[in-house]
Amino acid sequence: RYIDKRIPKILLCHDVIAQRVLRSSSYLMQKICIFSERMSLNLPNAHIFSFSQKDCDLIKQIYHKETNLCLDYIDEQIINKSPDKVEDYFTMFGDWRRKENAEGALWFINTVGPLLRKKVHIKIIGRGFPNKDVKNIVPNLNLDILGFVDDPYKILSQSKALISPLFTGAGIKVKVIEALACGIPVIGTDIAFEGLPPLFNSFMLIA
């Protein structure tokens, strides 16, 4: 509101905060976040963009604001990491300091892991993985916690698939797009695939 009303503005909505808080927050927090987001989107002379048609439609539905669809940028080095070989492991990839990422990964390890009948090797890439919250040693789950990696896309592109168990959050998940750009399939929950067009359905397994 402190910016000159005559100056055109571009607002880029990576995700719709209202959807995120409606899934996981208290009633009071929902009201506060929706009010704050509405104030931001009502800036005068602003042009709103979002990465998915789903979020464009949500902004229209909740805030009655027209939103333009734009594509997320994928670096050329990621696209060029198409797999030259597929090795015998899966990947999990993200900033594990984010609650929704850590909770999903721990759910998979502690709940799905004990059900595995064959040995499965998973390379976990990214900062802040909560090792201490892995409840038990799972016999058929070999976890390789790599932490921060300078070039995660080589590891990603040579894996069998990215595993992305998400139960909260909103917006397009960039790590899912990056995995698809690397040429590998993704195994995830419906929230992991939110906003992606049906064009990619053959590369996505909702589990």
Outline where the language-model segments fall.
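Active-site proximal beta-strand in glycosyltransferases
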Residues: 4-22
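Membrane-proximal helix-turn-helix segments that form the acceptor-binding/catalytic region
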Residues: 17, 27-48
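A short, active-site helix/loop in glycosyltransferases that binds the activated sugar's phosphate group
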Residues: 38-66, 129-133
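Carbohydrate-associated surface elements
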Residues: 54, 72-73
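Conserved catalytic-core segment of nucleotide-activated headgroup transferases in glycan assembly
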Residues: 73-80, 84-137, 145-152, 157
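Acidic donor-binding loop of glycosyltransferase active sites
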Residues: 157-171, 182-185
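Short hydrophobic beta-strand element within catalytic cores of glycosyltransferases
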Residues: 175-178, 185-189
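Conserved acidic donor-binding segment of nucleotide-sugar-dependent glycosyltransferases
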Residues: 203-207
